[in-house]
Amino acid sequence: MAATRIDCDIHPAVGGTRTTLLPYLDDHWKEQVVSRAIDGLDLNSYPPNMPFSGRADWRPANGKPGSDLKMVQRGAFDQLGSSHAICNVVYGAQAVFDSYMAAGFCRAINDWTAAEWLSKDSRLSASIVLPLQAPDLAVEEIERRASDNRFVSVLVLAQGETLLGRRHYWPVWQAAAKHKLPVAIHAGSAYRTAPSSIGWPSYRYEYYLAEAQAFQAQVLSLIYEGVFGKFPDLKVVLMESGVSWLPAFMWRANKT
């Protein structure tokens, strides 16, 4: 029997709000997008043109890395030998301040992912992108999409508005646990706070290395705030977190 290899983190790229997402937005947000000329909502965590954001041989002639389904299929399945892959769309919907706008855009992203990616290749699954700006709306999005078994986890950013163990997020974790959906905490920021504990860096690589601090803080928060005690069946996945910090972190946490 052939081994199953799952690429747990590939990134379909949203081409643009006024192009890619417009057909999937409701009438209100369609009008807002057009009248306000809202287009690119790429997170600064992953600038599309930065070499660090995509391999040179995975960049289409036109468009962002990850915007060409056939190129992504070739990279994930043919070149790397994966038998399955999970789509995690990292886009600015998780960073906007208007919670209703965030929810509308997250719905559109999830519907676009289902229609333009999952429906075209049975080897693809996806994470449900959540508007954590409003936990009640995040729960609604989980309930809306949980019956579609092509969605296998929920996606949140490592650096959001506050620590993920706080009680106002508990309804989200309860819904995820109820539907057996792991919480995928992915590298990235909503830029509400500095990425380091003592302020803002000057350079991209400082930010990149500082992300380990965010993951450490989130792990501590989930444990010490009692999330796993309240929801013992909840599973959490750290995406693009690195692992080299974990042994020293575990030693210090246990020692304390």
Where are the language model's segments positioned?
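Helix-coil boundary/capping segments in enzymes
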Residues: 1-256
